[in-house]
């Protein structure tokens, strides 16, 4: 089974939905459809997404842009996709995580972002461990607006 078939399967999309449905039920994209509203007709919507993915007719919608306040009067731009797009994105993420599992495991201790079970706490613990072993340099990298620059059409 190829990657597109795995991602577009009803089972994969249901799994993706199960991981999304718990979060911020009032969050919405440009159309205003919330997770709670999607949930009311989720089976039909998942079947429709699956069919359109398999037929090659699925189109990502434009994102809703918002500014999240940060400290010192600064703002962080955020792009919020439609709920259906989030289901597809999550299905892709689940499949890619499985596909690259071995590579991700090899990078443990080097990268802590966007990996299940890793976060700031684990990064700080690893930095302390490296310091105790004589290392004295840390590289911190942040790709500004990475997700905003991903070409959705090429996905």
Kindly give the residue locations of the regions a language model identified.
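Short, conserved non-catalytic motifs in the polymerase core
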Residues: 26-36, 61-87, 104-118
